[in-house]
Amino acid sequence: MENRYFKRDISWLSFNYRVLLEAEDDTLPLYERINFISIYSSNLEEFYKIRVADHKAIATGASQSDEETVQSAAELVDEINREVNRQLEDRIRIYEQKILPALRKHHIIFYQSRNVEPFHNDFVRNFFREEIFPYLAPVPVSKDKVISFLRDNRLYLAVRLHLKGAPVGSPNRIQYFVMKLPYSKVPRFIQLPKVGKDYYLMFIEDIIKANLDTIFPGYEVDSSYCIKISRDADILIDDAANTSEIIEQVKKKVKKRKIGAVCRFVYDRAMPQDFLDFLVDAYRIDRRELVPGDKHLNMEDLRHLPNPNQSVRPIKKPQPMKLTCLDERESIFRYVEKKDLLLHYPYHSFDHFIHFLYEAVHEPTVREIMVTQYRVAENSTVINTLIAAAQNGKKVTVFVELKARFDEENNLATAEMMKAAGINIIFSIPGLKVHAKVALVLRRDKEGRKLTSYAYISTGNFNEKTATLYADSGLFTCNPVIVNDLHNLFRTLQGKENPVFHRLLVARFNLIPELNRLINHEIELARQGKQGRIILKMNALQDPAMIDRLYEASQAGVEIDLIVRGICCLIPGQEYSRNIRVTRIVDTFLEHARVWYFGNGGAPKLFLGSPDWMRRNLYRRIEAVTPILDPDLKQELIDMLSIQLSDKRKACFVDDRLRNRWKSSRPQKEKVRSQYSFYEYLREKI
């Protein structure tokens, strides 16, 4: 049978490669290009710790899956490693042939080995002795007795030595040591004294390599290479666990994350085979876990690379704007009572949402606030404002998702802090994740008779830090049907049965039936010779059932544009997908919004909300999607989608071989960079 879907993880690697390509764009500020190498590397680290770790567990028989066999999992891990190795060549090429020369052009000399100019020899030697040497603790490595534990995602230097005076062939002549780089004590990147117009930088590991003779007196240094281990970081919670059991499992398993099973052993590919073989045997590394790297590993650290030359063009992002209709003296409540409000972050300031909560804290007629928490910032202003509301006599209910990956500890800590302040905390639902990003404020008039509710439905988290980095949209509305639906959703989260939703689309209830109805209507229009039109913007498209519906629509003549940032398992360019185009946008901000357009014969229907079209989102999570009913806001989202589809600078097509194909060029004046164009569009409207 023909394979009609890309493999999820291979598709993700195609996205991450597109991230890497931003480092090659010489129209960007230099340090923004460097940051994209950091993002690429950080993404890859998490990918191995979660996705590859899962496949490896299945391949070794340590875990079971209904979707993979031992053989298919092993083959997929091999395919992933081959693609990562291929991308490594481009990462090295971009770094060495693009980034380093660009730094030199700006008089920033970044040493790439232990060899430095003679005028820096004394500095390197003195800096090592005074700042680094006290924190080094070499540990011997033996095949028979490993006495060191390699910590997750920490950089180590593996050293091979010859004992001076020992005859060739004697058993103790060749010895091996490992040293953890003292990241917590000394920066990864060291600034050396400026000479003339030139600034100099150096990796800490290269300074250590230049002084190995000081660390190991009595030995001759044979060679040294960097290594690192990535460990399985996934946390599996028993679906049958109750709330208290979930809390205990999260606490225990988060602690074990740092000592999880090895899923990747990364090493300097210049390491001789016999050196590598020794380490593999000593640390009991599975050969399938071996991933060659460059001489400098953990390139995610490049986000901390110093910029000593202030004349280098800084990273300049659009600054969040505040709507003039919502200055601090204006009531958001009164505005939303008259007209729905749509905000787009980070173009609009997240302060507007904070002000919405702040107004709820201090408005005497507000009785209750309800919010979902998936990922919040540390020392969160949102959480602090909710605590202030509880202390001010408001009833506050927060649903806390403890199973939000890598945010488990923060969510648990903030939940305990809120609970201590008198907030009603509802924890994770067994067997489900709650991914909906919704808030509800209930307010009665001064006589206590009329109830007015204010709903907020968003594509992004209530996180003031990521709201400056992720491109998301959120709707404020007092629409009575949507508000009532949101009431029902919060009742569902509190354990009430059989909710009914009329306008809000909620995963595991009415979302799939409504999506099928919307797609069917576009198919019927196309079959009648009318225009069938679908535009879907999301982070990931993976669910085979929904992909098949899009294939069906394409074959019926529906024109479909997909704006998918990351995973896309739909294969374009086939007979069954000839009317489907896949666009991917990677730029300054992380595209995170989920916005859906259905042409509806000229009376378009638009929606925004939290789910991607992945099986986990559609079938195993609680997600919320709202229709956009206000004609002006509908047009605003249509314009946003149109701007993104016309992007000729940061958008590319994904072809039938998962290649990122740049869109055909146009005259320079017509080139659209959608994030910046949309920012200007919104600025003109304020």
What does each of the following model-derived ranges do?
Residues 1-534, 552, 556, 568-686:
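N-terminal localization/anchoring segments of enzymes in phospholipid and broader phosphate metabolism
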Residues 274, 544-545:
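Short alpha-helical
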Residues 546, 550-552:
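Polyanion-binding catalytic cores of nucleic-acid enzymes and NTP/SAM-utilizing transferases
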Residues 559-563:
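Hydrophobic alpha/beta core scaffold segments
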